[in-house]
C-alpha cells in the first residue's frame, strides 16, 4: 500500500489508540496523540509511538487529515460537539467504539458537511489497559467492522478499509450500525457477561487455583474487565444483550433439565450440536 503522507490524530491514547498509532506509524508523516493523561502522552512521545502529544485538541485537529477517536462510547458525541469547528476541512473521522446505536446519526448532524465520519469497530483487545500495553500484534488476524452511513464518500470508506488491512486485520465487514449492535451483543458482550458471571459464581469454599485447568482459564480470561468501559458497552446495547442472555439461559436450562432427568440422550445431543456448530465457526 502506498504511503498516505498525511497527518493522523488519535484521540484517546490508551490500549487501542496505541495499537492504531503503532500499526499506522509508517503510513503517515505525522501522528499526533490527544489525551488528558499527560503520562500517556509523554510515554508515547518517548517511545516514538506519536510525534507529539496534546491535551488541548484544537491544534492537532486543525492539522489532521484523519482522526481516529478511541474514547468510551459516552464520550465520543461530547468530544465531537466540543470540537466540531476545530476539524480540518475535508478531513475524515473514524472511531473504535464497540456500540453504535444512533450515535453515528447524531454525530454526523453535528459536523460540518465537508467532514466525513466513518463508523468502525476493531474487534480486538486485551484484558489490560493503557498505551504501554499496546502492540502491533493485537490487531493481527482480527476482524474489523465498518458501519457505513448514506452520507459517507466511497473513497473514505475505501480508505478505512485499506488501512484496516494495513493494520493487520484479516477480514473487513460492512454492516449497518443496528445490525452491528445486534451481532456484537452475542459475539462479544454475551461472552464477557458469561465470563464475569462464571468467575463471580465461585463459592470460594476451596482453593480454586489448585483445580483450575485450561478450560477455566480460556473461559475466564476476559473476566478481568475494565468496569467503566464495559458498563458503557453493556448499557448502551442493553436491549440486544438482554435478549441474548435470555436465549443463553434457555440453552443452559436444556442442559440443567437433562441432568435433573438423567437424560443422557438429550445431553449428548447438546454436545453434538455444539461440536458441529463450533467447527462451522472456526
Task: Go through each PLM region and give its residues.
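Rossmann-like NAD(P)-binding element
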Residues: 58-87, 91-94
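Rossmann-like NAD(P)(H) cofactor-binding subdomain of soluble oxidoreductases
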Residues: 81-132
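Interdomain hinge/lid region at the active-site interface
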Residues: 205-274
